[in-house]
Each structure stands twice: as structure tokens, then as C-alpha cells.
């Protein structure tokens, strides 16, 4: 759907709105072998074939939660990236799809819905093989991060602007 295209696809392949930006995401153009268009969603991809650093190829499959868990079933995969909190049915499918390959499931989200079952399981009941990275406001700050030898991405002026929008 549009959200998958505008967030995950854009991060990995480059802005879907600008043909010249294709290959400017986390995956460089030189590694993108081919893509398949997603029917019904302008500028969206359903699959991308990527030249892996190992010499083999990896296929990326872009799915959205609104497709339902049935569309997530069957295929064994190495990695699943869940952007925004999934329902338990999708999360369970993601874990199941990676089991036989000893793969990984990444989730990146702000717990907008509060202490859901998924959020609680990571905050209160972290299991062996799981990890939780808690990104804080200070982690985003250029000033505070630079004092720790890290790279934040928000200037003080931008942070003040964001905070004032919530006041």
C-alpha cells in the first residue's frame, strides 16, 4: 500500500516520487538487479531482486499489514522488517517465516497504542535471542549525541519546534 511504499520502499530503494532518486536509499542502485511493480499502487514495488555482498541474490518482498496474515504465510525468509507495530497475527507469521533459516525479525515503531501485548512482551518479558533498543529524545539530539561521540539528526532549533507543536 502507499504507507509501505512511502516508508519502507523509500528507505531501502529511494523516493518513489522521483525516478532520479531510485537507488538512493539504503540499497545502492548498483545492487538493485530488478524490481516488479505492485499493481494498483502508483510507483510501488512488490519485489526487488538485490545483489547480496556474498555474491548471491536476495529478494525483497514488500507487504502491508492490511493484506492480512494469509499473504504472509508459506514463504521462508531470512529477515523481516516490520515498520510500525503489527498485530499479533502478523508478528507471529513474521517469526514463523524466519524459523527454518534462523532469520531475524526487526520491528521499528513508536508505541502509539501504549502498552500493547507486543510492546509489553519486549519491555517486560524479553526472551533469549530478543533485544530491545530504546531510542530516546536525547538520541535524536545533535548536541547531546555529539557529546557522547554519536550522531544525532535533530538540531536544537528543530527539537524546540517539534516540542512546541505538541504543546
State where each predicted segment sits.
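Phosphate/NTP-binding elements of NTP-utilizing enzymes
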Residues: 1-167
Amino acid at each position: 500500500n502507499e504507507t509501505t511504499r512511502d516508508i519502507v520502499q523509500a528507505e531501502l530503494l529511494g523516493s518513489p516520487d522521483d525516478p532520479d532518486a531510485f537507488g538512493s536509499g539504503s540499497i545502492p542502485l548498483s545492487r538493485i538487479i530488478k524490481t516488479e511493480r505492485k499493481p494498483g499502487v502508483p510507483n510501488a514495488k512488490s519485489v526487488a531482486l538485490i545483489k547480496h555482498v556474498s555474491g548471491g541474490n536476495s529478494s525483497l518482498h514488500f507487504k502491508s499489514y492490511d493484506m492480512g496474515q494469509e499473504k504472509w504465510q508459506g514463504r521462508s525468509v531470512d529477515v523481516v522488517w516490520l515498520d510500525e507495530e503489527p498485530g499479533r497475527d502478523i508478528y507471529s507469521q513474521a517469526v514463523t517465516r524466519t524459523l527454518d533459516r534462523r532469520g531475524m525479525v526487526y520491528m521499528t515503531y513508536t508505541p502509539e497504542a501504549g502498552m500493547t501485548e507486543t510492546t509489553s512482551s519486549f519491555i517486560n518479558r524479553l526472551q533469549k535471542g530478543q533485544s530491545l533498543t530504546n531510542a530516546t529524545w536525547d538520541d535524536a539530539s545533535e548536541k547531546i549525541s555529539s557529546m557522547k561521540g554519536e550522531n544525532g539528526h535533530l538540531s536544537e532549533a528543530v527539537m524546540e519546534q517539534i516540542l512546541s507543536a505538541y504543546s
